[in-house]
Amino acid sequence: CYAGLYKRREGGLLMASKIVLSGYYGFNNLGDEAVLYSILRTLRTSKPDLKITVLSGDPAQTKKLYNVEAVNRWKLQEVFKALRQCDLLISGGGSLLQDVTSSTSLVYYLGVVWLAKLLKKKVIYYAQGIGPITSWVGQKLVPLVSNKVDVITVRDQESKNLLQKLEVKIPAIYVKADPVLGLYNREIERKSGQDLL
């Protein structure tokens, strides 16, 4: 499981008390909100006293829905403050590192990671779906930034292959299930258990 992986890493979840989550959150996208819910559930199950801050397009809504701290992802001063005060940045899940829909979004997510590393914070890619990455800029920036990340998990072998093709080689890359799939599987297990009663 994800929590077990991070606990085994020095300076990872076991050591972190303040975590920042970066993803496509606060835009009323059902899939991405399910990803956020699943990540929060995993983190809180592993360590209930975590202080979690989400970078969100709608901080007020995110605070209300998930009982977390949230800051406006577009306000650099707020993002900087959240990263400066955290122990760990989790980037993901979802398909954040791609430039098909927009190269701007790729630069944004990599920029958040880059800023966290400048502040000497631990960074995890969480169940990322990588690619397509077609632009010259994207193909240069992804390995430049990703080789500074502490732990990388991707949701499929294709994503791992692409990172390796782009020469991301410093952190180990783990293939793990999409967190939403894990949430779905737990729900099936719960219902199956009820049916047996």
Feature-to-residue mapping (PLM):
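Active-site anion-handling motifs in enzyme catalytic cores
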Residues: 1-3, 9-197
